[in-house]
Curated annotation (Swiss-Prot):
GO terms for cellular component: cytosolic large ribosomal subunit. InterPro entries: Ribosomal_bL17, Ribosomal_bL17_CS, Ribosomal_bL17_sf. This is Large ribosomal subunit protein bL17. GO terms for molecular function: structural constituent of ribosome. The lineage of its organism: Bacteria, Bacillati, Bacillota, Clostridia, Peptostreptococcales.
């Protein structure tokens, strides 16, 4: 059974952080974050796109329960999901940028393909 990375936070903080990162990804199309956060965000974002590809009311309500903005859910179901209708997974890409200046954390860009 796959486990989540802890990311140095308790479970409530981690879950809300991932929800916010997924919402930001669908709002802007790309986000810049650290590599472990990007890998966890990718897992959640790909699940949301697969859910949106179903397109039924139950899937929409599940997405609304996960994401923090209703307009982003509408965008996901009406614009993003139809674009990936014929693709089975692999909706996102991680591009590494190298270490961050302040703390040398590996930074990368997570974007929709």
């Amino acid at each position: 059974m796959p486990q989540n990375r802890k990311l140095g936070r308790d479970s409530a903080h981690r879950n809300l952080m991932l929800r916010n990162l997924v919402t930001s990804l669908f709002k802007s199309g790309r986000i810049q974050t650290t590599e472990p956060k990007a890998k966890e965000t990718r897992r959640a974002a790909e699940k949301m796109i697969t859910l949106a590809k179903r397109g039924d009311l139950h899937a929409r309500r599940q997405a609304l329960a996960y994401m923090t903005e209703e307009t982003v859910v509408t965008n996901l179901f009406e614009e993003i999901a139809p674009k990936y209708q014929d693709r089975n997974g692999g909706y996102t890409r991680i591009m590494k940028l190298g270490p961050r200046q302040g703390d040398a954390a590996e930074v990368c860009i997570l974007e929709l393909v």
